[in-house]
Amino acid sequence: IPLGGSSIEIYVSTIGYPNATSCTVDATLQRKIGSSWVDCKTWSATSPSSHRELVDMDIYYTVPNGTYRVFSTHSVTDSGITEYEYMFSDVVTISS
């Protein structure tokens, strides 16, 4: 989500099951260079031990002008089985 100027907000979350033993989320900011998407930076978060079924990540980041998206990997482990989900955000263009 563009915030104005050259700042963006990246928010990702994962909600698992009540008996989940862990939830994790990775968010990778990607910039479009020509016809390719190039990884810029990756952030990771893991659920706290007191609340294993939920993880949130809210990041504010300054970027140069360009076209961006976020690729996120969400995982939840329950009863020894880990499920994964992969998502792309909308594409945003930052220009001053």
Which role does the model predict for each range below?
Residues 1-96:
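Mature extracytoplasmic or otherwise solvent-exposed domains
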